[in-house]
Amino acid sequence: TAKLEEVWDSAQREYWDPKKLPWGTSDVESYSWEEREAIAYWWTLLSVFDASAPPVFAAAFIKTYEMHEEDAVRRCFFSVTRDEQNHEQMCGMAITRLLGHPDPLTYEPKTELGRRLQKNAKWLYFNGGRYWTGYKAAVPKYSLAVLFSSFLMGEIAAATIFHQMAAGCREPVFQEGFSHIGRDEGRHMAICMALMERDYPKMDLA
């Protein structure tokens, strides 16, 4: 469709590389360890979602081929998978810079707050595994429009939150990253909406 072609064109035009963000502008040593662990925890919460997104959209990308979807749909789902891989990488780079360790679950906390935050993060990762099991079972059963109607509110919320975070952030590297992610999520929302508008009128509600 013309709408999805527009989304694909913007995805190509707006592609970004997390490694090219201005990481050198961030002085993590200016923060206390409690602050560093708290900020890293925020990125860890985000990574619970963003680390699950690449395989989620990769499974949907494969389904577009199985369902013989038109070319624009397939390319759009590829673009979402690629975007979400960037978001996961952004989370990992932020966590590594803040903690000096690449994995928040095996990191040795330096404060009591850090220990409590890590305990909660481990529980969230466990729940994330349960979500993946449920999603894998749902992919063969439902159409793309039904599957991704459940993602629509998340994409709307993400686009809004990241634009607000970019506007209020004082760290240039995070500000730029938030701006890119918010723009990506806006495109993902447009893809969900386009599929729903195309397919919902044809669905049997019985």
What is each PLM-predicted segment?
Residues T1-A206:
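Non-heme di-metal
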